[in-house]
């Protein structure tokens, strides 16, 4: 009989369950802070419509800008951000390779346009979900 089926081996299962619960709690804390910042008027840039819907489902009510809907270019997104007149903007694009590339490009271009960028939510969520979740709309599930 494999060791995992022996009596008392539930410790590993319980430890994993506890770890997953702690991870979920941390993700929820980050999302609560994100909702607070959004409520204060800090816009959030996401990739598309599904990401907006996911954030709305998670209770985020403030301004959310879609970076890739309707064939927008980076210049279109920058122009939309400048119209917001916000002191700071949160970038929360997907966690895949293309999302990382767009995040880098947006950050560079927006900083050049003298816009303060907040990547802390992206960094914290990526550290928590790693390769388990590839996109923002996956956070809602």
Residue ranges of predicted features:
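Phosphate-handling DNA/RNA-contact segment within nucleic-acid enzymes
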Residues: 2-41, 49, 53, 76-77
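Charged, low-complexity surface patches
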Residues: 44-45, 99
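Alpha-helix N-cap/helix-start capping motif
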Residues: 48-49, 96
